[in-house]
Curated annotation (Swiss-Prot):
It holds the Pfam family Cytidylate_kin. This is Cytidylate kinase. Its EC number is 2.7.4.25. InterPro entries: Cytidylate_kin, Cytidylate_kinase_dom, P-loop_NTPase. ATP binds at G7, P8, A9, A10, S11, G12, K13, G14, T15. It comes from Xanthobacter autotrophicus (strain ATCC BAA-1158 / Py2).
Amino acid sequence: MVIAIDGPAASGKGTLARRLAAYYGLPHLDTGLLYRAVGAIVLAQGQLQDEAASVEAARTLDVATLDPEALRTAELGEAASVVAARGGVRAALLDLQHRFAAQPGGAVLDGRDIGTVICPKAQAKLFVTASPEVRAERRHRELIGRGEDVAYETVLADIRKRDERDSARAAAPLVQADDAVLLDTSALDIAQAFAAALAIVEARRAGR
């Protein structure tokens, strides 16, 4: 079984993906980390605006070296949004994601284009969202908890900028797949959101 979870930044899709993967005993890939890793590489090289450098970084990326905690900074979130808008970067990471999804038994993937581009035939598709304000509150708490000194207003502006860039890009824009189920987590806590997501997946498994 392949479960595809898409949605904007800080919508809760990653948390739900990890919990669903643990529940079903499936491997999980946060595809956003791939773009954050590419962003980290070109930032370190001083080449964030160099498309060729970002494509090369994506082409040679080793998933085994990813450090999720180190990649979850506000700066790398912004860098990820920049490099993810480049068709060459997305193409370079496509095969890696396809191979992950094709594992025996299935997988859970979350990102921006899983249900539309990476796994269009996934058995269960969710589009997880929440209001920009709620998402900014969540991301702000996360960043403060990690020791980053950042204002809520800055995080909200960043969320809105990333939403616009993700939705407007030419390469695999953020859109809800026609057969994805919308899950708005604005008023839900983690337990409620997981219960709703699990119900959606179980309904799809039962053919409903």
